[in-house]
């Protein structure tokens, strides 16, 4: 197993490149929350796989970001990267401790399952209120 250590402004981000059957693991401190489904670990942007949070100008957008800031900002996370990339972001499932960040924000009613990418693993955590208030983007279907 190879390990690459990146130092970024007094911050350590550690990436383990596993074998072909295991995901690449990135660990580090969350330095910025862009919105409800995108965080930055060190200077590396991560898009939460299978999670669709509202944009900042949409209903619940600012609440979803505030929830995410409270949950992860300044905390150590572990992200299992899929190998995919969207825009400038790597894609992965991230955990703070044993808590799946995607499960947490969807259970709170501030994001939806994006079944095209999640395989439906978060659907059971969606709330009725979120289903009424958040518009699922076409790319999630």
Can you annotate each of these PLM segments?
Residues 2, 12-141:
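Small beta-barrel nucleic-acid-binding modules, primarily SNase/OB-fold domains
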Residues 1-7:
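Sec-dependent signal peptide recognition
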């Amino acid at each position: 197993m190879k390990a690459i250590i990146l130092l970024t402004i007094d911050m350590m981000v550690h990436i383990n490149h596993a074998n072909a059957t295991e995901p690449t693991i990135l660990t580090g401190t969350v330095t910025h929350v862009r919105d409800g489904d995108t965080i930055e670990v060190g200077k590396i942007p991560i898009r939460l796989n299978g999670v669709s949070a509202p944009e900042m100008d949409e209903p619940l957008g600012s609440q979803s970001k505030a929830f995410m800031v409270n949950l992860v900002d300044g905390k150590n996370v572990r992200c299992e990267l899929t190998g995919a990339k969207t825009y400038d972001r790597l894609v992965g499932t991230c955990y703070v401790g044993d808590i799946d960040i995607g499960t947490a924000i969807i259970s709170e009613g501030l994001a939806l399952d994006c079944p095209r990418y999640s395989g439906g693993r978060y659907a059971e955590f969606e709330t009725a209120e979120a289903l009424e208030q958040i518009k699922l983007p076409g790319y999630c279907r």
